[in-house]
Amino acid sequence: MLLVIGLGNPGKEYQYTRHNVGFIAIEKIANQYNSSFSTKKKFNCEIAETISDRQKIIFIKPTTYMNLSGKSVISVKTYYNIYPAKIFVIHDDIDLETGRIKFKTGGGNGGHNGLKSIDGVIGNNYNRIRIGVGRPQNNQDVADYVLNHFSKPEYKTVMQAIDRITSNFGLILENKLEEFKN
């Protein structure tokens, strides 16, 4: 069983912001598996489930705001008894250029409040799929930057990255994490 978490903020006003690339990506991946989201209040998230290659995949989008994402993650992880090695968090990363993808297991949270929240409840030994959204320019506040919408060229670049993640997601199911990293 895999738990795949897309980080973002709920609400239409945040739908296409940099901070919501995790939501955008997970919706596309779940759609690839013909799985649609429904709200589960007891888990504080939207959840979609599917079975692929005899393996159950649970996709979640926390309905808490980013800073409280751990609340959703711990409730789903506990209910389904999922080990951290089988948890994959998809999130924005300002330390990567727009559209760049990096995969890592464990490590620090890089100041990302969603990851801080998750680390606080399950530790940090889970997998992360980081999608670059670039850095703010001209002393722009980081919070303002990640809560703003992409420019059209940035959005196109990010969607190409999400397409690559989606088309290679099967490697995760096959436990070919080294291949997925590349």
Swiss-Prot record:
Query: What are the positions of the active site?
Result: H19 (proton acceptor)
Cite the position(s) of the site with description Stabilizes the basic form of H active site to accept a proton: D92
Q: Where is the site described as Discriminates between blocked and unblocked aminoacyl-tRNA found in this chain?
A: N9
Provide the GO biological process annotations. Answer: protein quality control for misfolded or incompletely synthesized proteins; rescue of stalled ribosome
The GO terms this record gives for MF are: peptidyl-tRNA hydrolase activity; tRNA binding
Q: List ligand-binding residues for tRNA.
A: Y14, Y65, N67, N113
Q: What class of enzyme is it?
A: hydrolase
What function does this protein fulfil? Hydrolyzes ribosome-free peptidyl-tRNAs (with 1 or more amino acids incorporated), which drop off the ribosome during protein synthesis, or as a result of ribosome stalling.
Q: What is this protein called?
A: Peptidyl-tRNA hydrolase
Instruction: State the organism named in the record.
Output: Rickettsia peacockii (strain Rustic)
